Amino acid sequence: MRNMLLSLTLILSLVATACTSNTADTSQPTTDKPAENTTAEKPAETPENTVIEVSTVRAKDPYLKFDAGETYDKNAVYDALEKDIGVKVTNKWVVDGGNTGPQFQEKLKMAIATDDLPDFFVATPAQLQQLIEADMIQDLTEVYDKYATDETKEFLMRDGGLQMKSGTFDGKLMGVPESGTAFTPQFVWVRTDWLKKLNLPEPKTMQDLIKIMETFAAKDPGGTGKSYGLAVNKEYYEPTGALGLVGFLNGYHAYMKQWIDDGKGGLMYSDIQPEMKEALRSLQDMFKKGLIDPEFAVKDMMKESELIFNNQIGVLYGAEWTPAHLAQGAVKDGKVIQEWKPFRLLSIDGTEASTQTELGTEKYNVVSKKAKHPEAMIKLLNNWIVVDNHPTEEQKVYEYGKSRKESGNNYWQLSPVMAFNQGNNNGEILPKAIETKDESLLQTKDQRRRYERAMKYLNGEDISMWWEMLISGPGGAVSNTPYLKEHNLFHRNKFYGAPTPTMVEKQELLLRKRDEIFVKIIMNQAPIDEFDKFVEDWKKLGGDDMTKEVNEWYAANK
């Protein structure tokens, strides 16, 4: 077993490294030189019908609603896991916010630095790299090969093995990816009831959208006395969230935290390109006109959303799931009181806007070197893939809790290990199935679940399911995905390797400086030409070294 003491240098590095979604490198690790002795002792054979106990750590989710008497520590899902697969899960700790949020990441950083890890947990790409170098996690190659079912192995290879490769170092599987689809577009969401009220046409260009935002702010269609044009929250950089600016930036052909073609056969960093400066110039102009909440830089998504729910903002950018969030203000007392519609990203020029996307996984399930039963994590993964794709009636407990019926409680979020379909044909299937009410078209459990919710809304059984229609119905968000695929409008990050040495050392500082100057520019606290100084500083403070390392990787992995 490894030496229990980490060097002071490593501890300081782990404590200092930022792990929140705005500072952790979103590129994905692939083969790289691992630390030595990464293979832990082989797990002891577990006698059949013996329950094994393993620990993990959790982050609370605001969309999870517990049945009476249940908690994160004691609930129907944990009980079912112990009964069905003989794995008793305990939580070492539970904190507020998602597992990419600051509270969870700060707690996990300290757990890593003090060598106080649970048996298994979810790590970011940067954390995965650090944990390998610190010799704190197990090589899962043999355990995965032995305990993963054929279905699990096939499920995680549907992308040709890219995501599994990203968790593999020198041929050793160090982290099992929380797989997902790379097709995660951003949309611009607009209050269409306000468009009708003010006799405004639907937007076709970025210029149209800005005019709509100006009119919403000036005319105050919500009658509140104070309206803004665009909802923005302090985590504006989040590419798969809502109330951010990534979709807006993409409309200027600017991309956040991506390595993109430099036109010379290499890669360059997106944050420092001229397109970013032009997008920031436009945002600064919007801020000066009063189109953006002056307090956005200190408001999280929920706080900024109060302005949306209170009829003060009618435009925002967000992922396809955004209507589930908007429903909090859009549906009241069994009636839809706010009408929203998604639009594909709008462009500032004649070239269609691409929506940026990544590899499809930003999280890895890892097992502590001290864990006695690494196979438990694989068993949990096997179980999830079964119950999330083709559950029996009894296994619906994993999705709905004891009732085994849809009630909006989101019990599936209690599963401690997850993996999602790397492909996604919801856009090709759901809008047509819902429009024609043809269940025979449905191919996956997710599609059947979404279809059922949409039907409840259409049949008048449950108006609160309005949000599912806006996601999956005709004209809903997913109906745009086939067009985006067909016209190659997903802009992929071309670097998906392990964080380079300079990224590990300098990325946090560089991203902090970026966020500081970008927010100042937007809020008109710094002139737009401060962007040029930021670019110079970025290069001097490690950006040039990072670019060199990325291009060395790119040359070897094209």
Predicted regions: what is each one?
Residues C19-D208, K257-Q258, L267-Y269, T392-E394, ...:
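Conserved N-terminal structural module of periplasmic/extracytoplasmic solute-binding proteins
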Residues K42, V387-E516, Q525:
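Conserved small-residue motifs centered on glycine
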Residues P47-N49, A113-D115, L131-E133, S166-D170, ...:
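Extracellular/periplasmic catalytic domains that process cell-envelope and extracellular macromolecules
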Residues N75-D96, W194-L195, S270-F296, D349-T355, ...:
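Extracytoplasmic/periplasmic ligand-capture domains
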Residues P125-K165, I212-F216, G225-Q258, G314-Q328:
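Carboxylate/His-rich catalytic cores and anion/metal-binding grooves
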Residues T141, T168-T240, D261-L307, G314-A319, ...:
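Helix-loop-helix "hinge/cap" segment bordering the ligand-binding cleft or interdomain interface
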Residues E235-Q258, R281-R448:
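Extracytoplasmic/periplasmic substrate-binding proteins
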